[in-house]
C-alpha cells in the first residue's frame, strides 16, 4: 500500500487558494528558495499540505509562466510529445518551460483532442476509399488466378479429348492451342529439309534436260535451214554453176545432226534415278561431244551462203538501176 495523502489529515485546508496564502508562499520561497516542500507548511503557518504548496508554486506563482492562447508551434510540440510520451504532462512541460503541466493537460483535454478527432474523421473517408480500393485490387487478383486455373483446366480437357494429355497441362495447353506453334513449324521445316535435296536434284536434272533440248532445237533449226538452203540453191547450182557445198557434205552434216538427236533422245529416255549414274552419263556425253566434229563448219557455210546470196541480189538489181 502507498502512503496516505497528506490532505486527508485533520485541519488541512482544501480548495482554491486565497491571495493572502499566495503572498505568504511567494515571500517564503523568495527568502528560502524552492525546495524542501515538507517544511514549508510548518514554517509558513499555512494550513496546506506540502504537495499543494509545490503545485501552487510551479503552476501559478513562479515567475516566467506564460499565460494565454497556445501558439501553433506549441500545439505541434504538445501533439508530438503526447504521441511519444503519453499523458506524462510533467515530462511534456519540461520541454515547454513557459507552460505548466496543468495548463498543458487542460489544453489537451479541452482543445487538442477534439481537433485531432475532427482531423481523423476528415481523413477517414479517404482512408476508407483507399481500403476499398486495396480490397478491390485484392479481389481482382483472386478472379484472375481463378480464371487462369479455369483456362488451364480447359486446356487440359482439350488435350485429353484430342488424345494429347500430359502431366503438366498448365505448361502444355498454351502450346497446343496456339496455331502456328514452334512444334508445327519445326515439323514443316523437317519435311522441307528432307524433300529439298530431291527437289534440287530434280531441278538440276530438268535444267540439264532443258539445256540439252534447247541445243537440240537449235541444231534441228540449223539443219532445217541447211536443207531449205540446199533445195533453194540446187537449181542455181545446175544453171549458174556457182561454187556451193557438195551434197555429200550436206548428207554428212545431216547424219551428224540425226545422230546427235538420237543420242539426246536415248539419254533423255534412259535417265537413271541414281546420282552416280547420272554423273557418269553426263561425263560420257561430254566426252562424246569432244570427239564429235564442231559446228563451226556449218556456221561458216551459212555465213558464206548469206554473203553469196547478197552478192547475187546486188547483181540482179544493178541492171535495173
Swiss-Prot record:
Domain HTH myb-type, first and last residues per copy: 9-65, 66-116
Tissue: Restricted to stomatal guard cells. Mostly expressed in leaves, cotyledons, hypocotyls, seeds and ripened berry skins.
Gene Ontology annotations for the cellular component aspect, listed alphabetically: nucleus
Localization terms from the record: Nucleus
InterPro entries: Homeodomain-like_sf, Myb_dom, Myb_TF_plants, SANT/Myb
Bias-annotated ranges (Basic and acidic residues): 273-290
Superkingdom classification of source: Eukaryota
Compositionally skewed regions (Polar residues) per UniProt: 206-215
DNA-binding segment(s): 37-61, 89-112
Signal peptide: none
Keywords: DNA-binding, Nucleus, Repeat, S-nitrosylation, Transcription, Transcription regulation
Induction profile: Repressed by abscisic acid (ABA) and osmotic stress (salt stress).
Molecular function as annotated in GO: DNA binding
Chain intervals for the UniProt region annotation (Disordered): 196-215, 263-291
PTM sites of type S-nitrosocysteine: 49, 53
GO BP term (any one): response to auxin
Function of the molecule: Transcription factor involved in the regulation of gene (e.g. drought-regulated and flavonoid biosynthetic genes) expression and stomatal movements leading to negative regulation of responses to drought and responses to other physiological stimuli (e.g. light).
Protein name: Transcription factor MYB60
Organism phylogeny: Eukaryota, Viridiplantae, Streptophyta, Embryophyta, Tracheophyta
Designated gene of the protein: MYB60
Amino acid at each position: 500500500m502507498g502512503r496516505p495523502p497528506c490532505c486527508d489529515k485533520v485541519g488541512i485546508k482544501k480548495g482554491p487558494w486565497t491571495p493572502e496564502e499566495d503572498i505568504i508562499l511567494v515571500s517564503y520561497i523568495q527568502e528560502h528558495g524552492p525546495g524542501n516542500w515538507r517544511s514549508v507548511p510548518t514554517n509558513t503557518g499555512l494550513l496546506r499540505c506540502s504537495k499543494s504548496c509545490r503545485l501552487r508554486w510551479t503552476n501559478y506563482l513562479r515567475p516566467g509562466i506564460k499565460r494565454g492562447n497556445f501558439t501553433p508551434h506549441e500545439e505541434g510540440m504538445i501533439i508530438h510529445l503526447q504521441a511519444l510520451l503519453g499523458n506524462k504532462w510533467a515530462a511534456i512541460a519540461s520541454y515547454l518551460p513557459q507552460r505548466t503541466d496543468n495548463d498543458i493537460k487542460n489544453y489537451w483535454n479541452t482543445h487538442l483532442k477534439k481537433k485531432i478527432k475532427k482531423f481523423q474523421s476528415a481523413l477517414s473517408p479517404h482512408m476508407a476509399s483507399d481500403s476499398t480500393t486495396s480490397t478491390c485490387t485484392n479481389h481482382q487478383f483472386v478472379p484472375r488466378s481463378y480464371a487462369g486455373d479455369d483456362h488451364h483446366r480447359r486446356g487440359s480437357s482439350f488435350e485429353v479429348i484430342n488424345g494429347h494429355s500430359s502431366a503438366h497441362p498448365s505448361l502444355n495447353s498454351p502450346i497446343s492451342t496456339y496455331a502456328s506453334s514452334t512444334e508445327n513449324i519445326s515439323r514443316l521445316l523437317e519435311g522441307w529439309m528432307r524433300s529439298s535435296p530431291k527437289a534440287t536434284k530434280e531441278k538440276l536434272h530438268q535444267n540439264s534436260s532443258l539445256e540439252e533440248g534447247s541445243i537440240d532445237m537449235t541444231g534441228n533449226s540449223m539443219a532445217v535451214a541447211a536443207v531449205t538452203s540446199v533445195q533453194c540453191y540446187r537449181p542455181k547450182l545446175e544453171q549458174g554453176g556457182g561454187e556451193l557445198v557438195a551434197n555429200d557434205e550436206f548428207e554428212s552434216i545431216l547424219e551428224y545432226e540425226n545422230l546427235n538427236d538420237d543420242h539426246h533422245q536415248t539419254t533423255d529416255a534412259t535417265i537413271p534415278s541414281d546420282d552416280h549414274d547420272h554423273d557418269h552419263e553426263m561425263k560420257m556425253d561430254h566426252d562424246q561431244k569432244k570427239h564429235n566434229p564442231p559446228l563451226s563448219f556449218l556456221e561458216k557455210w551459212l555465213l558464206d551462203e548469206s554473203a553469196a546470196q547478197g552478192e547475187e541480189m546486188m547483181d540482179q538489181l544493178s541492171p535495173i538501176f
